């Protein structure tokens, strides 16, 4: 009767046309209901509709209104939250396999089976990789997954490492050693083994890729400058282009430095032995001769040579720093030659620091946090380490070497792996200017500062450096921390471009080829120039992979650290330990505070800061929270936080500001 009825079809079209569709992301709550987060609005998702979705799903939904209430009815799936995911195993009362997703907001328990390639017998709590196979909105079936990889047992103390590496699809083993390694030299090697090269590194370092020799340049008896000879390990001499080792290095891109151990980019036989500039061993190297005047200005062109070198001493950062800082009972150089090298390199470093202060930008000292681990992977202690003078000596030598490499490649190869940074994201230039003016200007200087911080000026190397130097003495941290949010990301490029973060017009690293694939590429380009060959333009695919690998490695480091911090602080909850902190972020949900002593991040919910929500206002442009119209908390602010809760299953650390 109703089949092919034009009136009915018209009615259906009218009903469909009158529906209000929205698209957004599902946000689960601690209860059975949830919310659909759209661009400018949030909609209530009732419990029955939440059964069709999970936290993070991107969906299309229909808005339903009843009286003055709005909610949505899920229509279709746009993109599932899960595809490949990490989970822990559990078994229900019928001994059926289920998966608990390793995500703080996903509460769904997902039934699963096991792929035939997984041969381990799974037990409750084991960590696995799984693939979502069916979704209620997409497949008209309940959620279902398949275990595709076993990671580790539930009681494995090194689960933070293995689970995190699996999550980011990173290898946990070094590249396998080859049966043998042969030198493939096209360039004649100069014998520089008589030069008194030294290395300065951490005592535990095995993969030493830089050694230094320095001497004064004199005209008669008068010193006019410095000659720095930078010897860098030469792994490309052992690794033919397009070999399996080259392909493995290209995929990994970096040595992964994790708490407790590293996963090298190259086989350990190369990284820790044949290529490492160990003391009293003859090693192949790519060497750069750099000359400066006494003020640290680079004079003339850098000369690169292929060479044999021999490090005469392996020195430790803290020992050298203690000696130069004249710490009581400090270590002393074991020979007159070592002492001379340290003293000369120290003088050169002071000149280069001053040069960069006036002509580029210096790093702000913030300290690095390192985990001291027991053999079983538990955290014994966490240390904060600051860059001392010996660290700066190596840092300044590597920076000038990389500046010279970039100029050499730009002039001769017309390509390279260049490290670049454009400063402020173009879309944030006017916002950055407004923030600077709102923070720093007065009625008297507003016109002058408006011109000084003009967007078109902030976009240039010179203007950006002038801006950074102008705020160096500003007493509160929030200014610099807020400006960081307006910056764009550093990028690898095949054409030379400025690095505004360093305040330098050209920069290309070549000083860590054992640890960085981009440095290996630059070594090959330098050698092509020295051989008189036409340098091949660096492929875009290499730059993309470098960018991706750098991001992955940072996420791995962060995720492992979050897990170790949770383990470390968990026993302190009962003692209600209090920490001196600095506010690292303010968001709509609360405040995130960094513990000064160990670097842990503690979340402080807004609900604990003030009991009247209507009197609280979050201002994202300032990264600040206002209470009753007064600024109460802002990024960079010093606060004291009491630890109240650590949730090991989600690695979340919670506290109260006191």
UniProtKB/Swiss-Prot annotation:
Xref: InterPro entries: CSD, NA-bd_OB-fold, RNase_B_OB_dom, RNase_II, RNase_II/R, RNase_II/RNase_R, RNR_Ribonuclease, S1_domain
The compartments listed are: Cytoplasm
Q: Which SMART domains match?
A: CSP (SM00357), RNB (SM00955), S1 (SM00316)
Q: Name one GO cellular component term.
A: cytosol
Per its UniProt record, what Pfam families does this chain match? Answer: OB_RNB, RNB, S1
Highest taxon listed in the record's lineage: Bacteria
The entry's function note states: Involved in mRNA degradation. Hydrolyzes single-stranded polyribonucleotides processively in the 3' to 5' direction.
The family this protein is said to belong to: Belongs to the RNR ribonuclease family. RNase II subfamily.
Q: What is this protein called?
A: Exoribonuclease 2
């Amino acid at each position: 009767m109703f089949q092919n009825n034009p009136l009915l079809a018209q009615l259906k079209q009218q009903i469909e046309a009158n529906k209000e569709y929205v698209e957004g992301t599902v946000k689960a709550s601690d209860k059975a209901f949830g919310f659909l987060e759209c661009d400018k609005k949030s909609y209530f998702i009732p419990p029955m509709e939440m059964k069709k979705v999970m936290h993070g799903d991107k969906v299309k939904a229909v808005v339903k209104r009843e009286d003055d209430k709005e909610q949505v009815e899920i229509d279709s799936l746009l993109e599932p939250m899960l595809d490949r995911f990490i989970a822990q195993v559990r078994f229900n009362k019928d001994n059926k396999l289920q998966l608990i997703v390793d995500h703080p907001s996903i509460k769904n328990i997902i039934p699963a089976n096991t792929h035939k390639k997984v041969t381990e017998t799974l037990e409750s709590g084991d960590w696995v990789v799984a693939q979502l196979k069916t979704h209620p909105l997409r497949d008209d079936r309940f959620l279902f997954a398949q275990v595709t990889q076993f990671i580790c047992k539930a009681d494995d103390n090194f689960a933070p490492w293995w689970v995190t590496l699996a999550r980011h699809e990173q290898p946990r083993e070094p590249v396998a050693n080859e049966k043998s390694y042969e030198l493939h030299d096209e360039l004649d090697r100069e014998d520089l083994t008589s030069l008194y090269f030294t290395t300065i590194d951490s005592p535990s370092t095995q993969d030493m890729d830089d050694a230094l020799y320095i001497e004064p340049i004199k005209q008669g008896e008068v010193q006019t400058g410095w000659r720095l000879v930078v010897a860098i390990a030469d792994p490309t001499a052992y690794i033919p282009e397009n070999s399996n080792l080259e392909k493995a290095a290209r995929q990994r891109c970096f040595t992964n430095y994790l708490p407790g151990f590293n996963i090298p980019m190259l086989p350990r036989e190369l990284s820790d032995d044949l290529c490492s500039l160990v003391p009293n061993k003859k090693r192949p190297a790519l060497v750069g001769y750099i000359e400066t005047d006494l003020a640290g200005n680079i004079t003339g062109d850098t000369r690169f040579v292929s060479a044999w070198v021999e490090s005469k001493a392996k020195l430790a950062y803290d020992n050298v720093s203690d000696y130069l800082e004249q710490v009581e009972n400090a270590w002393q150089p074991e020979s007159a030659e070592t002492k001379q090298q340290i003293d000369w390199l120290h003088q050169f470093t002071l000149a280069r620091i001053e040069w960069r202060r006036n002509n580029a930008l210096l790093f702000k000292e913030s300290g690095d946090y390192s985990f001291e681990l027991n053999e079983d992977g538990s955290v014994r202690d966490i240390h904060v380490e600051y860059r001392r003078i010996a660290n700066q000596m190596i840092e300044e030598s590597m920076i000038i070497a990389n500046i010279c490499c970039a100029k050499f490649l730009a002039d001769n190869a017309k390509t390279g792996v260049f490290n670049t940074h454009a400063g402020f994201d173009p879309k944030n230039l006017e916002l950055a200017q407004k923030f600077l003016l709102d923070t720093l200007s007065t009625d008297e200087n507003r016109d002058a500062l408006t011109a000084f911080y003009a967007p078109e000026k902030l976009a240039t190397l010179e203007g950006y450096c002038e801006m950074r130097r102008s705020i160096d003495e500003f007493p509160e941290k929030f200014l610099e921390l807020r400006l960081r949010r307006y910056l764009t990301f550093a990028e690898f490029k095949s054409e030379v471009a400025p690095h505004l973060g360093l305040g330098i017009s050209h920069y290309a690293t070549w000083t860590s080829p054992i640890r960085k694939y981009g440095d290996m590429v630059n070594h090959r380009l330098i050698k092509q120039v020295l051989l008189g060959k036409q340098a091949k333009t660096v492929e875009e695919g290499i730059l993309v992979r470098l960018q991706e690998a750098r991001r992955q490695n940072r996420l791995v480091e962060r995720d492992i650290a979050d897990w170790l911090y949770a383990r470390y602080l968990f026993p302190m909850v009962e003692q209600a330990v209090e920490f001196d902190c600095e506010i690292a972020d303010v968001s709509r949900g609360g405040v995130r505070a960094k513990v000064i002593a160990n670097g842990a991040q503690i979340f402080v919910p807004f609900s604990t800061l003030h009991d009247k929500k209507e009197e609280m206002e979050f201002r994202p442009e300032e990264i600040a929270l206002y209470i009753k119209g007064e600024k109460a908390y802002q990024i960079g602010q010093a606060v004291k936080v009491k630890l109240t809760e650590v949730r090991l299953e989600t690695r979340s650390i919670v506290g109260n500001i006191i």
